[in-house]
Amino acid sequence: MTNIRKTHPLLKIVNESLVDLPVPSSVSSWWNFGSLLAACLAVQILTGLFLAMHYTSDTATAFNSVTHICRDVNYGWILRYLHANGASMFFICLYIHIGRGMYYGSYMYSETWNIGIILLFAVMATAFMGYVLPWGQMSLWGATVITNLLSAIPYIGTDLVQWIWGGFSVDKATLTRFFAFHFLLPFIIAALVVVHLLFLHETGSSNPTGIPSDSDMVPFHPYHTIKDILGILAMLTLLSTLVLFSPDLLGDPDNYIPANPLNTPPHIKPEWYFLFAYAILRSIPNKLGGVLALVLSILVLAVIPLLHMSKQRTMMFRPISQCLFWLLVADLLTLTWIGGQPVEHPYIIIGQMASIMYFTIILVLMPATSMMENHLLKW
């Protein structure tokens, strides 16, 4: 008798994705982050669902409802901090996942890569709107500053901002719609994840060597299920350590002050995972130029497949490209640090230099180095 997992219409899909899926035998732990992201999304949707049961999206009561969740709801504090720090874990996994894609040439599967970029934008939008919901000082002013950037769009900018706000400033209407979208978007993200996997399973996974691995495959279960479970346990250990010992480590103290439109915080900044893009935005004195640079800092990922000049797919056997890749990582860490600093000397010039470096490495140095390495292969 044939196994039910191979014949049942629903179980067959699960079987082909999680049990009998052929995986290259050489994939390393850097391939774990896809499943970690799925785990993060599950944690965020579950904790968010329970938080939404107690939260009120009204400017008069939003801050107090979050306080009520932390003080009066059974295990409300752990739900709130799991959700807030879960977002940080989400972005750590996301950035490592993208970095692995760049290092090992996974971007050559262009459909999977492009869906991934759409997913990144969706996750960033969700996280931004979530940051507004507690209605602290940084929530209000962060929302005001970031949404105001759209006013740089010629002709329609001002009208667009007022349309998003639902009035002439960030107020009750803005908070209500942000809550609605913050609740909706994770389910859209989950649907996009399915599409992401659909495209991935059309081509099969890449591997560290960059060499076709059709002749050397292992089944996903039990080898990679065990490996993924280990990764998920490690991530949950890190997350629970953060939540139980230092829940406010990555947050901003200003968000414990109720939102006050009459009092501007001395230094407005987003959550740490947006600081690199915020630093790029601030490094350009012109408003429209800054907004374009901000969008391009993420959209530049879309041109990476077009700039692949190397005869080898991965960077595994390309030491000069490896140095450039880690230089890019160091540059992003520098931008993250600069984004959290006040706008004054020497931070301004460091931010401008790091922003130029970011685009130069991706758009100029990496393709040029690939061509040089191709030439060296002929020796």
Curated annotation (Swiss-Prot):
InterPro entries, per the entry: Cyt_b/b6_C, Cyt_b/b6_C_sf, Cyt_b/b6_N, Cytb/b6-like_sf, Cytochrome_b, Cytochrome_b_C_euk/bac, Cytochrome_b_N_euk/bac, Di-haem_cyt_TM
Keywords, ordered alphabetically: Electron transport, Heme, Iron, Membrane, Metal-binding, Mitochondrion, Mitochondrion inner membrane, Respiratory chain, Transmembrane, Transmembrane helix, Transport, Ubiquinone
Taxonomic source organism: Pteronotus parnellii (Parnell's mustached bat)
Name assigned to this protein: Cytochrome b
Residues the record lists as binding heme b b566: 97, 196
Taxonomic lineage from the root: Eukaryota, Metazoa, Chordata, Craniata, Vertebrata
Keyword hit for DNA damage: no
PANTHER family: CYTOCHROME B (PTHR19271:SF16)
Keyword GTP-binding part of the UniProt annotation: no
